[in-house]
Amino acid sequence: MMQQYQSNSYLFGGNAPYVEELYEAYLQNPASVPDNWRAYFDAMQNVPAVDGSNGRDIPHAPIVASFAERAKQGPIRTIVASADSDMGRKRVAATQLIAAYRNIGSHWADLDPLKRQERPPLPDLDPAFYGFSEADLDIVFNASNTYFGKESMSLRELLNNLRETYCGTIGFEFMYVSDQAQKRWWQERLETTRSKPVFTLEKKKHILDRLTAAEGLERFLHTKYVGQKRFSLEGGESFIAAMDELIQHAGSKGVQEIVIGMAHRGRLNVLVNTLGKMPADLFAEFEGKHVDDLPAGDVKYHKGFSSDVSTEGGPVHLSLAFNPSHLEIVNPVVEGSAKARQERRGEVGHKEVLPVQVHGDAAFAGQGVVMETLNLAQTRGYGTGGSMHIVINNQIGFTTSDPRDARSTLYCTDVVKMIEAPVLHVNGDDPEAVVYAMQLAVDFRMEFKKDVVVDIICFRKLGHNEQDTPAVTQPLMYKKIAQHPGTRKLYADKLAAQNLVPAEFGDEKVKAYRAAMDAGKHTADPVLSNFKNKFAVDWMPFLNRKWTDAADTAVPVTELKRLAERITTTPETLKLHPLVEKVVKDRANMGRGDQPLDWGMGEHLAFASLVSSGYPVRITGQDAGRGTFTHRHAVLHDQARERWDAGSYVPLQNVSENQAPFTVIDSVLSEEAVLGFEYGYSAAEPNALVIWEAQFGDFVNGAQVVIDQFISSGEVKWGRASGLTLMLPHGYEGQGPEHSSARIERFLQLCADHNMQVCQPTTPAQIFHLLRRQMIRLFRKPLVIMTPKSLLRNKDAVSPLSDLAKGHFETVIPDHEELNASKVKRVIMCSGKVYYDLVNTRKEREANDTAVIRLEQLYPFPHKAVAAELKKYPNATEIVWCQDEPQNQGAWFFVQHYIMENMTDGQKLGYAGRPASASPAVGYYAKHNEQQKALLEAAFAKLKGFVLTK
């Protein structure tokens, strides 16, 4: 079935323009199209138009073409239509033939270096399909709708030009692009050159040099470090020539910084031959020697690197992102890193910073994060002015090489059609075509600020890794590969056969490279060793910091009032919704000290004070502007707006004249790509408060790979710091298993080595101080905040303005009731919303012998603060940990041993909370209330079940 689908060229959505041109031909002359299409189009004429009319469709193509022709000819002249209807049909057929080659010429291009299959005949590309005979090949047709350089030419010449342009060793896909200017750009660039580059001898020698380097490194490592994993590039050596051309050509176009993301295949080759890592340093890693002293470290083919190289346009900074083995997950990280670098450069950022994504064919088609990341490409909050995509298409994914198993599309790149990115499929055995394709791709990206893909079809000489035996599952493929002499040799022989270089030239290059390897010298030339980039970030102030470092987060009352006045002042022409108008009015009262602050105002004053002090703030999420629970209202909407794209006002962008940027983005509906993007942004910009907010905390596990592989472990593996802040709405309020829990236990399980902070603040003053602490304290670690839902409007969860003008973030909040400490027999420790339920229950029960302590920071665990609070109650014999979550979830299993460390001999530790559950929460509201009542009673009742004694 899939083969039938692929064999019918009309059924591909990407070929819709081809069908449209066929329909245009039908409207001009129904007899000019095949019978089956004529019957289909005849039936369409009976379908009423959108306006209900039954008139016959009118062809647009002749009208458009006539205007184009008139523009070329200058003064209008009268053209007499031919009376020869057969000739008229042939003219239309010639136009159809041109359209067919532009649309599906890539299907017949010479792309596979292994030539495993004969190229099947495509009727659509055969003149006979359109009714042409052999005798018709010498008929001269108007060719003004092409860029072949002639106003007219014979059908034979036209056909040769089309085949040379669209069916050579590069196959082009661009006709699905909606923008006519982009389509014309491609047609002109390809047809004027017949898709053939004209390179100087020096350029050709340089290409051979890069192929020699690519092959030489792999062969050196293969013989010196036998059997060690390196994920060889052999079979895809043209990729190194492509990378070289990308960097050099982009540099000549004004690019000053390139951020690269790629998986393991060929990574070591890029490190040495593209970025200029010293071979001696790589060899040391193969031998188990490590320059860095990281708590965990990582394997060599995950490591990143940065360098500066010289190009015609000036120095270019190269940054290869660190990444895990989870394929394609680095894509959004690279985009976020590029975005941060672009914004540092201002308006020219898109021109000067270029993101480059290197993919494998199987992963590009198979991993969902690819689609999520592509969807960011043209959005306001995440667009980076177009990314360069290179596919190392070795036609196999581990052991899967049959397209019937690898994907459901013709090409592995078909996913990019969703954003109308053009694709250049190129035969890896034609290095000049690969380099030329890269030139075209760079030019397109710089011209149109859109993504573009270069798909290098090659092969994988060895197994998935060097310990694999691929012939076990791919015997036919690996027979072909065994007979292949290698791209370098093919190209060297070609240059020698053309008498461009001596016969021994290629072998001499091989020997020279081997000598450089033996000496451990640079092989990427020229690498700049002392270039200082003025846009580089200095991470030195953030090194060797402790979470206990002091941070003055208080803001004077006079400044708070000024900020409050600024963020509650709106333009007179702005008509607010009555509900929002009340929010703004209440915030003005809060700013004057006339009423206590709610959560939204605590956040706003934190943001306002930061941007006013020069710290940029970026907050993104699916409802970041308004807030999932309508508490934030960072973006105010004019109810009288007359245009959909106008009429909004952001008070936090109008705090002071020289303030830092405040950016709030309602994100696309994605967790994985958006969180990956924000991690990448934060890792490149330590001086900005970067926040990602989940719609509900429950949905954060849609980005679990980012949390596991980057946020929690990036520093101990790679030494990469990040101050990313996650806001995860969390709380048990009877909304069921999908809207209750941010899975706090999973974050706590990942905590070690002081790798991140997990906090659950319960007052507006606490969130104010916590957000400010994240910037003011020079300690850049991810911050995970379990934010409230019902507390956003809880009359007890408020703070006076004065609490923002004094104090700091309290990791532990003591009991504020006036208790007789000597009479306290039980101390209840808790975190989050349940605190308010507990104090209300205590009041109802008049349990004056019970103290309630709030743990606002769960990790790093605040031992000193906890110990100090417990010491206040010398006669307490029982400690109870109370939580909303089930026993196997929440913080219980994480905090119990920390609490035990701070207990005195003889004290007992008990648990009060929901029983263990496979689901985060019950779905029945009545059962939720029943459980909530039971856990509150258990917090004050006799200890039962699992009790620990110090």
Curated annotation (Swiss-Prot):
The protein's UniProt keywords, in alphabetical order, are:
Glycolysis, Oxidoreductase, Thiamine pyrophosphate
Q: Say what the protein does.
A: E1 component of the 2-oxoglutarate dehydrogenase (OGDH) complex which catalyzes the decarboxylation of 2-oxoglutarate, the first step in the conversion of 2-oxoglutarate to succinyl-CoA and CO(2).
Could you list the residue ranges that cross the membrane? none
Q: Could you tell me which species this protein originates from?
A: Cupriavidus necator (strain ATCC 17699 / DSM 428 / KCTC 22496 / NCIMB 10442 / H16 / Stanier 337)
Q: Which residues form the signal peptide?
A: none
Cofactor(s) needed, names only, are: thiamine diphosphate
Q: Which GO terms describe its cellular component?
A: cytosol; oxoglutarate dehydrogenase complex
- Name the GO terms of the biological process aspect: glycolytic process; tricarboxylic acid cycle
Q: Which family does it belong to?
A: Belongs to the alpha-ketoglutarate dehydrogenase family.
Q: How does it assemble?
A: Homodimer. Part of the 2-oxoglutarate dehydrogenase (OGDH) complex composed of E1 (2-oxoglutarate dehydrogenase), E2 (dihydrolipoamide succinyltransferase) and E3 (dihydrolipoamide dehydrogenase); the complex contains multiple copies of the three enzymatic components (E1, E2 and E3).
> Main EC class of this protein?
oxidoreductase
Quote the catalytic activity from the record: N(6)-[(R)-lipoyl]-L-lysyl-[protein] + 2-oxoglutarate + H(+) = N(6)-[(R)-S(8)-succinyldihydrolipoyl]-L-lysyl-[protein] + CO2
PANTHER family attached to this UniProt entry: 2-OXOADIPATE DEHYDROGENASE COMPLEX COMPONENT E1, 2-OXOGLUTARATE DEHYDROGENASE
* Any one GO MF annotation of this record: thiamine pyrophosphate binding
Q: What is this protein called?
A: 2-oxoglutarate dehydrogenase E1 component
> Per its UniProt record, what InterPro entries does this chain match?
2-oxogl_dehyd_N, 2oxoglutarate_DH_E1, DH_E1, KGD_C_sf, ODO-1/KGD_C, THDP-binding, Transketolase-like_Pyr-bd
| Stored SMART domains | Transket_pyr (SM00861)
Entry's EC annotation? 1.2.4.2
